Amino acid sequence: MGLSATHFHRLQQIVPTILNECPSLRIINAYYDGFFTEFPANDNAVASDGQAVAKWLFTPLQNDVPKLFKCSLDMNDGNWSSKIEPFKAAFASASSPVNFIVSVWFEASFAYAFVPFHLTNDETREQLAFKRTNSNRCFLLVRCPIARDANKWNQQKK
């Protein structure tokens, strides 16, 4: 099940915890809606769209299939490490696993600003990787098990 960011924003105005009300929601497509995750993750009545999406990403699906958040980032904001650092901090302090893929689209002239990384968490037996795709304009932030079925995960990334 998927949801566009525009529909999500409208639904969130009616039911603030809409993402928790949809336990099988796997994809949010916000490529053209201009928002990214915000921390702290929260889905209460005063939470922003970005906080609610962060809360949704960090709530695992019951079948261990990764959630997918597709977004684009506005390069005029300037401080891009501040967008990625909360993911690293949450990963470093995690005690339970969660699977997700964040597909981030950039303007071509700004894609150089990001440095790929790969981290592991021995307690959760997970890895967090930020890497460029075949396109110079798209990066993936992937949180997944260290030992995983590569074919299954590659299918999810498409």
Question: Where do the model's predicted regions map?
Answer:
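The conserved beta-strand core of Leucine-Rich Repeat
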Residues: 1-158
